[in-house]
From Swiss-Prot:
SUPFAM superfamilies: L35p-like. It comes from Escherichia coli O127:H6 (strain E2348/69 / EPEC). Pfam families: Ribosomal_L35p. This is Large ribosomal subunit protein bL35. One of its GO terms (molecular function) is structural constituent of ribosome. One of its GO terms (cellular component) is cytosolic large ribosomal subunit. GO terms for biological process: translation. The gene is rpmI.
Amino acid sequence: MPKIKTVRGAAKRFKKTGKGGFKHKHANLRHILTKKATKRKRHLRPKAMVSKGDLGLIIACLPYA
């Protein structure tokens, strides 16, 4: 049986947590920040958890995580 390939883009974007979930960085915080409210930017700063519906897709992309 051949090895399963890891999706490299997903490996760079998602990190596994201790309880088996995955965390990721929010979108919309790279450029064109002047028109975005300070509160919006502040809420985008912390890492977010992958939702339950998307978890299966991430697990399939990262078979060895």
